[in-house]
């Protein structure tokens, strides 16, 4: 896979290396039954006229024979042959003219090595990527070829560590929105085929974000928007639909596909009763649209319970019977659903079997609108009043403490003054005694 930029070091002149590669291709073709192959002679004639670009065209086309090489041709020979071709092509000022064809050849199945063909192709494509200038748009086409091979060989783990560099590459290539979209969709397809639904959805959203407002209603944008919407609705761990509703292309479904948009709004902010009303109104539509009805029912129950927890008020608790009624389940199933909503990360709390109550520690708002702001304002007012009360108590205690300290200080001063007064009284008596003594003398 792509890594630091490097070079291929091969000794020999262009003419010598061309002759070597052409001879190797002729040998392969003759082993495949093409006895008339004379690439070596054709390229020699062109070299006499110094038509190097024409020589390279023939070599690139001839390289298709490597995909059908006999099984006895080992991986080392396969890689060495392609490295030689890449070295020759890189010497041309028109290198961009040849690399797309080479990538196309490598994207095709390598019939000579069905088990290792994907690995061989990825090795060569990685070499092309890493020997190409970091800012060259050729890298974009090479990466698309790499993605095609990874998808064909179900080798997503090879791609995963490279995804973190994708934005940096696109910036270096100064990629236009349409080309970025194509790349994001290719990554999404690879992830989807590999069962990586979260990654597939992430890159599908990134592709949708490349549509400008004026193209949000285009047929292609509509198709991708519906694909993203269906993926979000049926994904077992996706509960926040704000990422969808913020997109212009999704908002455009309000006109082109109003039923789909209505369903999205229900999952974004409504409850199970609303979803059941929707199903009654559009009987059979969910199944006809290719959606998993059971998955939608389960998700709607979890979202409904999350909404109930968020709006539980200051009591921060929900009785079992209230949960059972809202989720349209039996009382015996309540604890199972509460555990599921906790596992989904929508709510935190604990069950009180003794009181048949769910005690809520934390809840998640599905949408944050006027009602939620009012609730936040109410809670802030409550906290402010509570803190005001605490502050008043603290100030009263502080005042009492200061008063006590002042009283203690006053008492200490009084004691000190009394002691000083006593000492002064004793000192006045002593001189009189001395005077009496002096008078006797």
Swiss-Prot record:
Domain of life: Eukaryota
BP terms from Gene Ontology: cytoplasmic translational initiation; formation of cytoplasmic translation initiation complex
Subunit details: Component of the eukaryotic translation initiation factor 3 (eIF-3) complex.
Entry's family note: Belongs to the eIF-3 subunit M family.
Biased composition range(s): Basic and acidic residues: 405-418
Keywords: Cytoplasm, Initiation factor, Protein biosynthesis
Keyword RNA-binding in record: no
Any one Pfam family match given in the protein's UniProt record, by short name: eIF3m_C_helix
Main location: cytoplasm
Entry GO CC: eukaryotic 43S preinitiation complex; eukaryotic 48S preinitiation complex; eukaryotic translation initiation factor 3 complex; eukaryotic translation initiation factor 3 complex, eIF3m
Transmembrane segments: none
Leader sequence segment: none
Protein name from the UniProt record: Eukaryotic translation initiation factor 3 subunit M
Keyword Membrane: no
Domain PCI: start-end pairs: 196-365
Listed HAMAP family: eIF3m
Described function: Component of the eukaryotic translation initiation factor 3 (eIF-3) complex, which is involved in protein synthesis of a specialized repertoire of mRNAs and, together with other initiation factors, stimulates binding of mRNA and methionyl-tRNAi to the 40S ribosome. The eIF-3 complex specifically targets and initiates translation of a subset of mRNAs involved in cell proliferation.
A GO term for molecular function: translation initiation factor activity
Compartments where found: Cytoplasm
Region named Disordered: 405-441
């Amino acid at each position: 896979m792509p890594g630091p930029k490097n070079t291929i070091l091969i000794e020999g002149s262009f003419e010598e290396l061309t002759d070597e590669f052409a001879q190797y291709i002729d040998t392969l073709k003759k082993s495949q039954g093409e006895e008339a192959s004379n690439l070596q002679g054709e390229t020699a004639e062109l070299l006499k006229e110094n038509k190097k670009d024409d020589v390279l065209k023939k070599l690139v086309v001839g390289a298709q024979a490597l995909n059908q090489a006999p099984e006895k041709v080992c991986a080392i020979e396969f890689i060495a042959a392609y490295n030689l071709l890449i070295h020759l092509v890189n010497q041309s000022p028109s290198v961009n003219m040849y690399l797309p064809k080479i990538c196309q050849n490598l994207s095709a199945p390598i019939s000579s090595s069905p088990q290792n063909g994907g690995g061989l192709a990825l090795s060569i494509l990685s070499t092309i990527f890493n020997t190409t200038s970091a800012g060259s748009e050729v890298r974009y086409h090479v990466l698309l070829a790499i993605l095609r091979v990874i998808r064909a060989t179900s080798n997503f783990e090879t791609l995963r560590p490279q995804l973190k560099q994708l934005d940096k590459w696109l910036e270096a290539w100064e990629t236009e929105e349409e080309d970025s979209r194509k790349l994001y969709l290719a990554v999404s397809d690879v992830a989807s085929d590999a069962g990586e639904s979260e990654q597939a959805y992430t890159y599908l959203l990134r592709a949708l974000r490349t549509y400008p407002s004026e193209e949000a209603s285009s047929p292609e944008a509509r198709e991708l928007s519906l694909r993203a919407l269906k993926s979000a609705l049926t994904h077992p761990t996706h509960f926040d639909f704000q990422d969808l509703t913020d997109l212009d292309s999704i908002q455009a479904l309000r006109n082109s596909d109003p039923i789909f948009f209505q369903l999205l709004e229900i999952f974004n902010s409504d409850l199970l009763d609303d979803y059941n009303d929707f199903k009654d109104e559009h009987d059979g539509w969910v199944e006809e649209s290719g959606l998993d009805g059971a998955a939608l029912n389960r998700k709607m129950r979890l979202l409904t319970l999350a909404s109930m927890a968020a709006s539980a008020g200051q009591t921060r608790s929900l009785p079992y019977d209230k949960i059972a009624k809202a989720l349209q389940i039996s009382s015996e199933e309540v604890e199972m659903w509460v555990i599921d909503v906790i596992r989904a990360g929508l709510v935190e709390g604990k069950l009180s079997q003794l009181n048949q109550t769910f005690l809520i520690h934390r809840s998640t708002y599905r949408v944050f609108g006027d009602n939620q702001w009012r609730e936040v304002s109410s809670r802030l007012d409550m906290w402010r009043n509570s803190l005001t009360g605490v502050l008043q108590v603290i100030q009263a205690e502080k005042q009492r403490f200061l008063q006590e300290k002042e009283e203690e200080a006053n008492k200490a001063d009084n004691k000190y003054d009394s002691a000083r007064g006593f000492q002064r009284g004793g000192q006045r008596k002593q001189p009189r005694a001395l005077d009496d003594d002096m008078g006797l003398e």
